[in-house]
Amino acid sequence: MSARLPVLSPPRWPRLLLLSLLLLGAVPGPRRSGGFYLPGLAPVNFCDEEKKSDECKAEIELFVNRLDSVESVLPYEYTAFDFCQASEGKRPSENLGQVLFGERIEPSPYKFTFNKEETCKLVCTKTYHTEKAEDKQKLEFLKKSMLLNYQHHWIVDNMPVTWCYDVEDGQRFCNPGFPIGCYITDKGHAKDACVINSEFHERDTFYIFNHVDIKIYYHVVETGSMGARLVAAKLEPKSFKHTHIDKPDCSGPPMDISNKASGEIKIAYTYSVSFEEDKKIRWASRWDYILESMPHTHIQWFSIMNSLVIVLFLSGMVAMIMLRTLHKDIARYNQMDSTEDAQEEFGWKLVHGDIFRPPRKGMLLSVFLGSGTQILIMTFVTLFFACLGFLSPANRGALMTCAVVLWVLLGTPAGYVAARFYKSFGGEKWKTNVLLTSFLCPGIVFADFFIMNLILWGEGSSAAIPFGTLVAILALWFCISVPLTFIGAYFGFKKNAIEHPVRTNQIPRQIPEQSFYTKPLPGIIMGGILPFGCIFIQLFFILNSIWSHQMYYMFGFLFLVFIILVITCSEATILLCYFHLCAEDYHWQWRSFLTSGFTAVYFLIYAVHYFFSKLQITGTASTILYFGYTMIMVLIFFLFTGTIGFFACFWFVTKIYSVVKVD
């Protein structure tokens, strides 16, 4: 078992993202978290069986989560496999975020007693008769899962049981999961975890990990309270073809299942457990050893800081150019008003009579602005709370639950913003406006989500959202979000239309012939480059956490990148808006929204590149699911960035035309 493993992709466990984000602190810094007690989570004390009490437990429960694979987007519940099942035990209640993430935590048949070591204990035995259709189906499902490298996820004391091994660069990697088994191809090639044992050599054969050696580390409480706290749980998967099924000794050749096997196949599942005191690891920093060991998530701090510095430098340049140029323009225009050449206006001042002319499709633009405002505020508040530590990473699903609840409650600003701008655009169909704000963008997302859910239902995946949860989501949408949107729209329409600093002429001004660079499409395409440049590094790690099963724990950096993205979208849009106004093109409303919103197109292109260059996903259903969920993210990002660009340009245009003298 000493052979070094190549880096195996950690299991798909997006929820672990929520459990690990904050443990390195709220802001960028050294990788070690320094240790602190998590909000909303009290440590559990354990002690020997004879000393147990209400304040000190002796029994250690092991829970199992869904199984998933790096080669498939389809996770399955533990009970979908023919493993040993718990005879009793209550399934932990799940919050909305956990259900949406597809988390399925269940009790397991593995029960331990603190400080009581056990060796080669039999859990259960599974017997398969290959001539029976039902047994053959179960066995084939098990084989397919091993072929796709499906992985277990076990939980002890609300933290993952990890499998730690050496990787190619000589470092130690701790995987928050372990595979069901592995496969030797008909050409003798060892896939995935089959490289750990030289005895795995039979061609066209599966080897199932039917035994685990578990070691639980604890830290004795130094304060007045009694007992110890668990700080780590590690395991090593093994395979044994037990000679005596009823009295296994955990020795001998590995448990092989040939593709050509026939007759009766018996698999005995066993485990050994031991305990060890660790005086170095504290309960509050017990996640450090997992986060610090992950080879794929070692962040190149210099690379990220370099990108941030470049973006800040470019943003500073844009700001300086805008301030200096505008200052000179405004001074020149105001001086000209007192001279004989006052009538010879030029540049952006020429279009003052058309700058606030209502845009085409003002209804749709106002609806997008309302939904974008909802997403913008939701993102800011969620990231801010996460950085402060209010969303406990040990409270599984807390981040997703917070985001959904915020989105539902932020229907009021969405309706208000949509109504205010629609009224300022001269719109009168207020009922249509509020209905579209309530249902258009959320409806598109829900329709996409529902189609993806139908595919998951058809595949029998545990990620399929239960019907009751879908009803609950619809209830939140229709019974809370929609009424709040109507309330916001009521106040938005009740207020007077936004007052502009200059009057709009009755006859539209003719726009002169534009150069290539000032035409709409080139400007929109160029406008998204700079914002995308400031997020693509973080985007890589976020996509890794979602699709390549890696933990993402840099909320501090993510919040900084969020702020820089807002600044960059604003300044890039303002800069291009200024150039277009100087070219006497006053159609800035849609252009400003699409300029920064085009960042979402680069996001989509990057997601396609990521799929083909980084992922190992196979199968039509998994491919459809990947791009289906990607389109939801792209739409949300489009509304988010587009709204930032519009508001920045609206503020800019209002500001510059309010400080110049117009006859």
Swiss-Prot record:
Protein name stated in the entry: Transmembrane 9 superfamily member 2
Main function: In the intracellular compartments, may function as a channel or small molecule transporter.
Cytoplasmic compartment segments: 322-374, 420-437, 488-522, 576-591, 653-663
Biological-process GO terms, alphabetical: ceramide metabolic process; glycosphingolipid biosynthetic process; protein localization to membrane; regulation of heparan sulfate proteoglycan biosynthetic process
Membrane-spanning residues: 301-321, 375-395, 399-419, 438-458, 467-487, 523-543, 555-575, 592-612, 632-652
Signal peptide from the UniProt entry: 1-28
Lineage: Eukaryota, Metazoa, Chordata, Craniata, Vertebrata
Ranges in the topological domain labelled Lumenal: 29-300, 396-398, 459-466, 544-554, 613-631
Main subcellular localisation: membrane
Gene responsible for this protein: TM9SF2
The entry's keywords: Cytoplasm, Cytoskeleton, Endosome, Golgi apparatus, Membrane, Signal, Transmembrane, Transmembrane helix
Similarity field: Belongs to the nonaspanin (TM9SF) (TC 9.A.2) family.
GO cellular component terms, semicolon-separated: endosome membrane; Golgi apparatus; microtubule organizing center
Membrane topology reported for the UniProt record: Multi-pass membrane protein
UniProt-annotated location(s): Endosome membrane; Golgi outpost; Cytoplasm, Cytoskeleton, Microtubule organizing center
